[in-house]
């Protein structure tokens, strides 16, 4: 019985560590996107303020649709949906960043990236609470959130420094379509 409890504790700790890595990587990806989107739209697509406002439709409509989408996926596990959401974020960011697609295609991939991000937000908290020890839900949520915020801040600083000192640029495409 004692070995069984020790085994459960180790499994829980491993799950917490793996999910902490996922949360940190997700925060880094989110930091890369949120810290650069406005400049990306301006430099690559030369959007004005009205167009920038219009871009909020594909960026925020997944948030409105999220309740419907999550309820439609209720038969799937939180971990499975979270994994799919991260793939959506990655595909959206990679296509926009590496290929700088046409304006219309960019809006589609912005929607895809945002859909993944909006799906992950509520699942992040749900999975965090599932991984909490009894009586430590608040502490566990705080721990995950603080690490995510730290990763986002470090990423924002790296983005700032990279553009400030010329390591990053919107002018060069990594891959040409």
Annotate each PLM feature:
Residues 139-160:
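Glycine-rich segments within core transmembrane alpha-helices of 12-TM secondary carriers
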Residues 24, 92-94, 104-120:
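Hydrophobic core of transmembrane alpha-helices in multi-pass small-molecule transporters
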Residues 87-101:
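C-terminal ends and interior cores of transmembrane alpha-helices
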Residues 37, 119-132:
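Intracellular juxtamembrane helix-capping segments at the cytosolic ends
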Residues 72-87:
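Cytoplasmic membrane-interface "Motif A"-like loop-to-helix N-cap segments
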Residues 6-63, 148:
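Helix-loop boundary and gating motifs at the non-cytosolic
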Residues 43-44, 67-75, 97, 154-176:
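Transmembrane alpha-helix termini and helix-breaking/packing motifs in multi-pass membrane transporters
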């Amino acid at each position: 019985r004692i070995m069984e409890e020790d085994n459960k504790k180790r499994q829980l700790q491993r799950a917490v560590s793996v999910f902490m890595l996922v949360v940190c990587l997700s925060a880094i990806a989110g930091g890369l996107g949120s810290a650069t989107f406005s400049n990306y739209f301006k430099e690559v697509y030369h959007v004005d303020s009205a167009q920038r406002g219009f871009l909020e439709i594909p960026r925020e409509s997944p948030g409105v649709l999220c309740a419907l989408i999550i309820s439609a996926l209720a038969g799937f596990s939180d971990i499975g949906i979270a994994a799919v959401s991260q793939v959506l974020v990655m595909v959206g960011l990679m296509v926009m960043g590496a290929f700088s697609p046409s304006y219309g295609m960019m809006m589609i991939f912005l929607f895809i990236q945002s859909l993944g991000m909006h799906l992950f937000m509520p699942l992040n908290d749900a999975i965090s609470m599932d991984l909490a020890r009894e009586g430590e839900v608040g502490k566990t949520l705080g721990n995950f959130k603080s690490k995510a915020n730290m990763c986002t801040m470090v990423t924002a600083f790296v983005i700032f420094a990279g553009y400030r000192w010329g390591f990053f640029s919107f002018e060069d495409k990594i891959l040409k379509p």
